Amino acid sequence: MFGLGGQELILILLIILLLFGAKKLPELARGLGKGMKEFKKAQTEIEDEFNKVVDEPPRKTPENSTGSKS
């Protein structure tokens, strides 16, 4: 996970705890969770739309009837 080990993650969490305090952590985690959920939802919608476009059969273009034949 981004090249971070367990000790680094614990250190980062302790710094966050010191910066925001214990009362703000649940609110921050809730906001982060909602943000990740929205991001994944948008990502899924984009992937579905892309797959739908890719899976469509190619459209035939109308041939030009005024063109000259050699």
From Swiss-Prot:
GO annotations of cellular component type: TAT protein transport complex
GO biological process: protein transport by the Tat complex
Disulfide bond found in the keyword field: no
UniProt keyword terms in alphabetical order: Cell inner membrane, Cell membrane, Membrane, Protein transport, Translocation, Transmembrane, Transmembrane helix, Transport
Subcellular localization: Cell inner membrane
InterPro entries: TatA/B/E, TatA/E
TM ranges: 1-21
MF (Gene Ontology): protein transmembrane transporter activity
Membrane topology type: Single-pass membrane protein
Disulfides per UniProt: none
Main location: membrane
Top-level taxon: Bacteria
Region (Disordered): 50-70
Basic and acidic residues composition bias: residue spans: 50-62
Subunit structure: Forms a complex with TatC.
Function comment: Part of the twin-arginine translocation (Tat) system that transports large folded proteins containing a characteristic twin-arginine motif in their signal peptide across membranes. TatA could form the protein-conducting channel of the Tat system.
Stated family: Belongs to the TatA/E family.
Official protein name in the record: Sec-independent protein translocase protein TatA
Organism: Chlorobium limicola (strain DSM 245 / NBRC 103803 / 6330)
Gene assigned in the entry: tatA
